[in-house]
Amino acid sequence: MKYRISFFVLFCFSLPLLSEEKPVYLAAMAKKDITGPSVGVMFWGYAREDQTGLGIHTRQFARSLVVRDISSKKLLAYVTAEVGGIPFEIQRDVVKRLQTELDPTFNYGNVLINASHTHSGPAGHFHYSEVSFYSKEFYSDSYAVLRDGIYESIKEAYLKMKPAELTVGKTIVNEAGVNRSLSAYLANPETERKSYSDNIDREMLQLTVSVSGVPIGFVNWYGVHPTNITFDNRLISSDNKGIASLLAEAEAKKQGLNEYVAIFAQANEGDVSPNLNLNNTGPGKDIYDSSFIIGKRQFIASQQILKSEGKRLSVGLVYTQRFIDMSKHPVSSEFSGTGKAETTCPSAYGYSFAAGSTEEGGGHWLFHEGMTNKNRRFYIDWIAKFMLQSPSDELRECQNPKAVLFPMGETKPIPSLPQILPYGLAMLGELAILVLPHEVTTMSSRRLKNEVRSVLKDKTTEIVLSGLTNDFSGYITTPEEYSTQNYEGGHTLHGPQSLNALRQEFHKMSVELKDGAPATPQTIRPLDLSDRIHPLKIPFADVVSNKPQSVIQPSSESYKKGEVVSCRVAAANPNVGYSKVPSYLWVEKLENASWKPVRSDADYDTKFFYQKRGIWARAEESLDLVWETSQETKPGEYRLVHEGLYLGSDGKKSNYRIECPSFRITEPGI
């Protein structure tokens, strides 16, 4: 009976994907670890120098889909990396290596690297770092781990492509996001707002990939910030998007699909918060519980799509790409909304950027959302001039009504932020994918999609927006939203014409794809700052210590299902083993007189915290190993294990392993 049930579940899992039609694509998916250094590195996202790592909640992964159109031989690689943002340099280096080592047809237009936008991952991988508010350090080792992990995930998928069927499905996701900038949204025309049922985009779109009728994974687009885990957190975490992926992959594994890859990509999350209470708190008892709840809601929605009948994508893979100098891009009167030609502006942060999003915990106390040129303060301008430089009058006028705080695009000899940015449009059958390096608000996304739809018409039935892709460059708001200068407007770097410039360019790219016209010749490229960066070593990677051996605070002898298990052990700094240790924490279960791993530090129900007490020779380094059991945990005998590397006085790094005393998990009431 057990095997009949298992077969029935697997059959239902793959039922929507069964088809007798001949596949028109080759495809495969893959996943690689890209976890950053877990101790002492500032996290990327909240721009708080005091938020540095002290351990791991979940690991970071790069998940890839590679597709080849069998008839045209064209390729498309789509990756979501669980980091806050992807710099263009990563795409540049990955594309170069793909071209030289794998396939020369890879290029900037068909390698799409999306950031999940977790705010709980280490920074240090951006070349524009000298005056960055997200991190002023550049770590070549962690940059290499991110770059190589993305490359290896694409390579693995490319090498195992098989005839595949691609289907698209949709559903509505409830209680997973809320508009955090409602006053800005309400500034949009009432007639436009009435065209939509909600102030956020609750639609989830999923591209499912199946081989021989069995799903091997999917790419899922739904826009919501991974900010359930707030700036109080000190543990690396992929937040709600990563948890959704882990839940989907675990569910597939139950059906015997051990290589299943679930990509929860980032979309139009610009003004969408998962903190449903709009006060930096979510629906759970703490930040980790809230992250799990919002992640699970996305996972459940994705399962609903899997169980429904999807629409099979027909043959046809095309794409186009261009670099745009957003510091001075002309916007024609047809798109400007002012009746005359306009331009975008050199990038600038506004006062309200420094205010942060109030609903996500806010920023500096000197600022508040809604500050415009009318709210400028002479002492703030003086401090900003001392920290960077004063903006020109031309920049203030171009960015109006933004109260310019830092004129990032006017610094010399080079701008302090990238001005030349990558954009693209890809079509996979009837699915159109807009590619942007920005966080795009709900209404901005709708206008961009409508622009593409107005050109492509019946050539596309589904359109998704892939934000935070191939670079990072702040937000895109509508001109009306920009005028309110909430956080998102203050972080719309290139001024009030930014969205209109992109509407214009996506219109042109849509025409190129519709007519089969050649892409616009590339005359500009992003700056190469390779010779200007000053790489640093990963902190604490060379700390000498004796071999850790002791259990400092053992686990209890017994726990009920649902209780939290912990054990404190002596440890070397985890950064000594950075990128070499597959897991610093294992949960092992005794089965048939043999210990077998059942959990690692990649799982959402484990954590480890690094601590250092004392100074100099009397300092004690330790890890707190934590496992949150659940009602689904099977009774039995378990133990927590720590593995790592230590650097001896002889200069050699060696492995060590510490096993905590075993304990029993029992049913409640026993």
Model-derived features with residue positions:
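Bacterial N-terminal signal peptides that target proteins for export
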Residues: M1-S6
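N-terminal signal peptide c-region/cleavage motif recognized by signal peptidases
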Residues: S14-P16
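Non-catalytic substrate/cofactor recognition surfaces at enzyme active-site rims
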Residues: E20-I670
